[in-house]
Structures are given as structure tokens and as C-alpha cells.
Amino acid sequence: MGQFTVVSLGLLAMFLSLSGAKGDNCPASWISRNGVCNKLFPDRKTWLEAEKRTWKWSDRTSANYFSWNQGEPNDVQDNENCVHLWAPSGYLKWNDEPCASLHPFICQYKL
């Protein structure tokens, strides 16, 4: 699994844990948490399109937590090299999928 997968999952987990309190130093519509500003962008982009922006996804440290859905990762047709959060049973689990899939994304920068 590529490094971008780990980064993407880390961002999704980070966004889900945000308190919702806006910091005084973040622009309007951004959320401050632990010294960084975060924003969810609802427009859908591939990983490569989102990566072209000037924002950092995370500190690029290795993941030490995994929450794969049952039977995942299964790399269908040797084409599923990215991960998204999926809730087939009401609980968010990881599922591998093609990297060209479109999803909302989160950007972050240090204050």
C-alpha cells in the first residue's frame, strides 16, 4: 500500500475527531485544532488532483492503526491502491479502491 493511502486515512480520521471550535488565527470556514488549521473541501478530486494543491496532508508518519472492513484489502483487478472510509454496517471501516475514485478532501496548514 502506498504512502498516500496512509496519509489520506490519517486526514479522514483527524477530521472526524475535530471539535468544531474555530480558532481565532484560522481563516473563515477553517477549523483550528492542535496548532493547525483544517478545512474539508466538498468538491471531489482524485488523490493526484488534491495533492497538486499547496496544502500538506499530514506529517507523513507511519500509521500504527488499521481498521479494514472484513475481507479488505482485496485489491480487485490489481487496481485498488487507495483507501476510503466506508460504512456498510453503520460503522466506518477501511476499504481499498481505485485511486481515480473521487472523494471530498481535507487540507491543513500550521498556524
UniProtKB/Swiss-Prot annotation:
InterPro entries: C-type_lectin-like (IPR001304), C-type_lectin-like/link_sf (IPR016186), C-type_lectin/snaclec_domain (IPR050111), C-type_lectin_CS (IPR018378), CTDL_fold (IPR016187). Ca(2+) binds at residues 80, 95-96. A motif (Mannose-binding) lies at residues 72-74. PROSITE patterns: C_TYPE_LECTIN_1, C_TYPE_LECTIN_2. GO terms for cellular component: extracellular region. Pfam families: Lectin_C (PF00059). Residues 1-23 form the signal peptide. Gene3D superfamilies: Mannose-Binding Protein A, subunit A. Keywords: Calcium, Disulfide bond, Hemagglutinin, Lectin, Metal-binding, Secreted, Signal, Toxin. Residues 33-108 form the C-type lectin domain. Disulfide bonds join 26-37, 82-99. It is found in: Secreted. The keyword Cell membrane does not apply. GO terms for molecular function: carbohydrate binding; metal ion binding; toxin activity. Expressed by the venom gland. Belongs to the true venom lectin family. Mannose-binding lectin which recognizes specific carbohydrate structures and agglutinates a variety of animal cells by binding to cell-surface glycoproteins and glycolipids. May be a calcium-dependent lectin. This is C-type lectin lectoxin-Enh1.
